[in-house]
Amino acid sequence: MGLNLKAPPGAASTAKAGGEAAASLLGTASGNEEPRLGAAMRELTRPSSNAGRMLMCAPAHYCVDYTINPWMENQIGKADNALAIRQWTNLARLLAREAELAFVAPAPGLPDMVFAANAGLAIGGTAVVSRFATKERQPEESLFHAWFEREGFKIAPWPRDMAFEGAGDALLDSSGSLIWCGHGWRSNPGAARLLETIFARRAVSLRLVDPRFYHLDTCFCPLADGWLLYYPPAFDAASRQAIAELVPAEKRIEVGEDDARLFACNAVEVNGRVFMNDASENLRRRLRAAGFEPILTDLSEFIKAGGAAKCLTLKLSET
């Protein structure tokens, strides 16, 4: 299948058809990667008629030059930007077969902006823009706010002093009636109650206890038809109990340490296909038995900064 990427109309910082807009989207990549990335993005601006929409941010400025999670330790200066661009483009091409992709322009000096899941949480035309816990990512907030505003989202007010890192720590279940909310490392535990009020649906707060899994989406992935892919040791006992009470045992796909470290739970599910960095054959077999098709795509350069497929995307059409 050919590429099916469409830029949303009316957004100055999103891709439009043609090379000029692609160059604007990408900003300035380093060295010889600028023409290569620009060419890829021109290809990724072809129209799509598929339902569903996701936000991504090109890795033109991606690197690891600070440490804000355990995955970044000893990785400063070691990320290969050229390889990251190829990996990100491969993911975008795969997703473009299933959904319409929108883009926010990357900004120099903000290497983690590529992790678009942390732009905010968007449900039914309303967006909550993230309030980052770490000073390194706080300059991203105004850029994401401007993007949501240009796209016509209603921006819900959010307290300046309440950390909330978007769809990294807030995930909608497949029924749309429940928001799973993570806290413990980045987002404030009070975020769940505010999200309940803003989006008029139940929010369940889950406490994360393993610093390697600092966002909910690194260890917890709601799938279609009420299925759940998750790593239980990332949660405290009360949170594991809450999950058990809300998700039937036969629909819980538990992953082990090895798969968790591969960021298997940091996956994106679209139309029954689960896009992920990697997974053991055992986990792939269990996903297939549940009716899902695992699609593996190497995202190892982004794991150096603590993210994979889910971190690189934000669903915009959830209701």
PLM-predicted stretches and their roles:
Residues 2-10, 18-19, 23-319:
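The feature marks the mature, well-folded catalytic cores of soluble enzymes
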